[in-house]
């Protein structure tokens, strides 16, 4: 996933796309949530965070990596026209990105990354796959299912169960590659005193 995020940043679109993909991976946000982020939703400071507007008008704030916060600062410096009420990641015309825009830009990023990482060409990388990667990363880092559900904005922790199952399946595949040692079962022979005691009962 990091290879996909590492898009060239020599153009305005490249800088926006890099920030877009970084925030998607950092937060695990839904596409609708990430394209709805406004400048006022970002808090940059000792502890930086972004406020996401999820399903059912529910809001949640998520911490940002220092690198992501730094990238947002640079982006805002390069785009002084962006006001508090402006979308953080606009199109060229200043309007908000659409789901189709995000899918298209992600597809382009994957195509660019495939030149250096051919294995990516075999994968179907989608916005939801980035969200899934965030969930799996949290799980493998030891985060419990309830906290992952809160992070992703799931209505119920039971929705997160599929990520736990996916991680278990991954571990089972790893275990299957390990051949168990060939230990021959030996017959247990109890001590004579134990046999006599059991016979006396």
Spans of features found by a protein language model:
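Conserved catalytic core of the tyrosine transesterase superfamily
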Residues: 1-201
């Amino acid at each position: 996933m990091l290879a996909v995020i590492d898009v060239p940043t020599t153009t305005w679109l490249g800088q926006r796309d890099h920030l877009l993909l970084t925030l998607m991976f950092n937060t695990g946000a839904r596409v609708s949530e990430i394209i709805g982020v406004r400048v006022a939703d970002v808090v940059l400071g000792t502890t930086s965070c972004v406020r996401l507007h999820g399903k059912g008008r529910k809001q949640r704030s998520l911490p940002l990596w220092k690198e992501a916060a730094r990238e947002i600062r640079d982006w805002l410096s390069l785009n002084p026209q962006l006001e508090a009420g402006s979308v953080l990641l606009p199109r060229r015309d200043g309007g908000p990105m659409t789901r189709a825009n995000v899918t298209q830009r992600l597809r382009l990023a994957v195509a660019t990354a495939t030149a250096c990482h051919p294995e990516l060409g075999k994968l179907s990388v989608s916005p939801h796959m980035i969200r899934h990667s965030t969930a799996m990363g949290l799980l493998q880092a030891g985060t419990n299912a309830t906290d992952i559900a809160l992070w992703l904005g799931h209505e119920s922790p039971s929705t997160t169960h599929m990520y736990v199952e996916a991680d278990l399946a991954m571990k089972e595949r790893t275990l299957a590659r390990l051949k168990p040692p060939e230990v021959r079962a030996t017959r247990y022979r109890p001590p004579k005193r134990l046999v006599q005691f059991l016979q006396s009962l």
